[in-house]
Amino acid sequence: AIAAVFCKETGVMTSLKLNGMEIINGKDGFVYDNYRFIENDRSCKPGNGLDSIGTCEIVPSKGGSVIVKTTRGGQLASQVITYTFLPNGTVDMDVTLTPQAKELRRAGLVANIVPGLRNVNYWAYGPDENYNDRKESTMVGRYQTTVDDMVVYYQKPQSMGNREGLRELTLTDAKGKGVRIETQGEVSFSALPYNDMHLAKTNHMYELKKDPFITLHI
């Protein structure tokens, strides 16, 4: 069974329960995120540039499905996310991001996930951290890790843990319950115990304290 709650003002999904289990932490569902903290780019401003107000509407559908279309403008990028809730318990997300600026630091979504889903199983490039311009040393396959083990200990805290070529991602708790995400197209992901604002405000890795949620970038 699926239960979802949306904010009428912003269009953000504030709650997603799968068979009674909450997936979204603190009402912070999927939104466009531009901020990526790199130590050499401290001058770059944080924030996603999204408008404070968006839209949220239920679209007529057939076959027992429920379709919710959300939109939100922004100075850096505008987003249209259409959620289709299927009778079999699947939530299909169709995402369109339209750049409004010449240079974006990210082109993807971020969500805060409940902290208990710390076990990570993924089909992508791995097992080590990799990026679009340096993934040749890794191989596509299915890998198991944890949110904590996706942390990379750089000399200074910064964005980390990315995996390219994502096709399937599962986040589960100690009992094996959680959420599975399948993707299409060129997609990467990271699942970390810190968000980029937290990394930017911390000078040394040993000073980092885990956030009370998991930051999922897709």
Q: Predicted segments — roles?
A:
Residues 2-218:
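Beta-strand/loop-rich accessory regions of lumenal/periplasmic or secreted enzymes
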